[in-house]
Amino acid sequence: MDAFTLPDFYLSHPARINQHVERSRRHTMEWARRMGMLDTPAPRGGLVWDEHDLAVMDYALLCAYTHPDCDGLTLDLITDWYVWVFFFDDHFLEMFKYTGDLAGGQDYVDGLERFMTADGEDPPEPANAAEAGLRDLWRRTVPHMSDDWRRRFILSTHNLMVESMWELDNINRNRVANPIEYIQMRRRVGGAPWSANLVEVAAGAEVPPELAGSRPVSVLVDTFADAVHLRNDLFSYQREVREEGENSNAVLVLERFFDCSTQEAAELVNDLLTSRMLQFEDTALVETPALMAERGLPPGRQAAVAAFAKGLQDWQAGGHEWHARSSRYMNDGAAARSGGLGGPTGLGTSAARPALSSVEPGLRRRSRQHAQPLLPQVGELECEPMYMPFALVRSPYLDDARVYAVGWAREMGMLEHVPGTGTGAVWNEQDFLDLDLAYCASMIHADAEREQLYLSSDWLAWGTYGDDAYPRWFGATRNLEAAKLQTERLPMFMPLDTEEDDAPEPANPLERGLADLWLRTAGPMRPEARRSFRTAVQVMVESWLWELHNQALNRVPDPVDYIEMRRRTFGSDMTIGLSRLAHDEEIPEGIYETRTLRELETAAQDYACFLNDLYSYQKEIEFEGEVHNMVLVTENFLDVGRETARDIVVDLARARMEQFEHILATGLPDLLDAWELDDRARAVITGHAEGLKYWMSGILEWHRACLRYKGDYLRRKHAPDPRAGFSWGPSGLGTSAARLGRSPSTAAGGVRS
């Protein structure tokens, strides 16, 4: 009996099939035999695959559906890649997941890595069918692609192999990931970014290097990956979870997290799949063309990006059709419900599907996403108790920092009206004192020396000022172009060569503060660290544009995009990066990019972001007209009340904190051993982890103490000014500078931290 009934899928693009499918079926069967995949023994007896297994799984059909336009030779190559990756997955399962052999699994993966060679390097002799297949495919593919593509493909292939160890470790511990951890890790282990690289091969259209790391292209790949993986999890739950004992499946993850039935969890996974596909469409049709026009990309490169996006869309449609037909999956009735082949083709044909049922989930989700009322009276949201296992530590220099911080803000002009903005001062002195950012700095960087604490306080003040100023200066007028110009100016005040003096004259407190902070921060840093910290600041500032854009559209963000962008708008990388400055030269390059430390940091970041959204809910929703709040995003996505949404966000924060503790107890010691760090470097990394504890406990304490989130304070601050002879109505983006019955002197833009 099937575990659940498959939900109604959002299918906005028709599947098509490549005419060379029969040729590739014959070719890939012979290729797999030649590589040794059809006579590899399984430890429990029998073979990993035999000829019948490969025939009924029909990977040639998968590739014919997912790459409908490529020629026969290319389809053969693509099909062989998929045969290889599925063989790797099944061989790894048989050899190591069932046996729990972590050491053997690591050796197996390390052996495969040696076959991803650079120009002029000779691979070793293969010791098994997976190595033989990879050596052959590398020789047939990589010489025809650019160095940039090779670099990206090595990374995605590395991830899908290496992160199999994460799955194996969770199986051994009988541990099911939390939803956020699962989405992040599934991208790495699930292989869809790898599939996106092969779309470039099949389409003969490489993504231009200058766009490969941009937000639109990254979102295209991430939404594609998430949709592919979520769809696969729905179809494969029966086999993976009920029959094979896997625990890396989104249906199982949500079933456990929400304590709901399998059917309810499947419906939630499908809702998330729909949301990710809608974001893919928005990004492909709006953000990506706008970026190409802004960068002045030549027509040929624009065509390549369009072909890549269309290839990803074809993959989604074809991948669904294959899942609906393959013997590998639970799919009773799915093929008939998918609508079959045919229909109009190409990006943007979602309105021309013959069956309304195939687009109805998307229409329902899109309408709810844009239906948020303005300034609803939500009242205070009780958000305690928050799980916090770490003690609070406070700097002895707090009082000095408080005195210093307000003087610095005054000197930078942050407490005065900025000419040309059309609004009053972003803050007055009492606003700044009520914020008490020095108190926050004294806890998140509790071990800082006096001058370091001053610097940390000033960075918090600068980031919070900018986050307030953007909606006030640019939001109410919807002047997104002016916001973009301001954003483009800010990097001028962060020169990588600190000896250069060609920055323009600062035009406002935001620029003046950044110029001052950069001189005080970047001077002692190594060039690599300086570049990394500069990127962290830029990422935060650019995320403010994303918020303005969503406000202009009155669009409540997709939950996955919100969580990932919230880390940026919160300035998480920037504030965490400040704590690394003193120890930058004492650790090996690249260690902060390992899965262990990135997962440790993102778990901490999400905890902090969620607690901020819980405490600031009334302030942001009722008084500022925000759409960027995790409680609201949860309300909107799940169509639940605010108390239910609050409880879910509290549970998510706890899950991320428990993951943080899990990594501290297991992943961090393994990382230190694997990198063979000396005592000094070990002390730096463990000190960094300790600092993250201070960071989270300090942010929680600051929110508990800070006036700005308390209902009485908010009502007083936003009360009508009796001196005003007129009332101000909501006007434009975020309405942060225009409240009903509130004077411009009392209406302050939303602090997002």
Question: What is the role of each PLM region?
Answer:
Residues 1-753:
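Alpha-helical, largely C-terminal catalytic domains
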